[in-house]
Amino acid sequence: MSERVFDRELSEVKARVAMLISVIGQAYELTEKLLNTQNLSLVERIIDLEKESDALESELQKKASALIALHQPVARDLRFLLVSMNVGHELERIADQCLNISQRLEENSKSLPVDWPPEILEMISRTRDMLNSATAAYIQHDDNLARQTIGQDDLKTSVMHKYLDLINKKAVDPTRAVLFILISRHLEKIGDLARNIAEESYYLIRGEFIKHLRLPDLYH
């Protein structure tokens, strides 16, 4: 394979990741809309997007794996392919979490509508911001965006402990409380996956594993 052809193949890999990012962005946007409006007609579209993301991620893995096997790329190109495969995998897992959220609401349709507690409303917004900045770091090759995403506080909240305590005190509808706990866990997982994407992007750009750096080193 000539260098020009190989470069074109690398560009196609990045384009596939970009397509996957677009699909996951749509899936999260619809999931956020579903949470805010509790309009269950949105669930079917989220299911379709999850299936689309699964197919795109599978194509990406096959494409990148074939390039590694056939071309035996040099370090920089190998790093790009491996990172792109990892990012694709994390993106597909985000689609899974969006699907999980939609299914939770569908399962609890008789309990809807609900007023989400402030902690969950904050998680919805912060998760969106983390996902946007993490994916932009990969596309724009921006280590500053990667650092900003990695440096954000964890999305872990006191939702679980708060509502388990209220359930024990019989001070809340247990079905609704369990829904709050489950939704918060899914949002937390999306935030964790977004941080993983940012870490992969940082490694792609700087060639350093972020987990091996002390926090102050992120800003040097």
Name what the model sees in each region.
Residues 1-220:
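Cytosolic, long alpha-helical scaffolding segments
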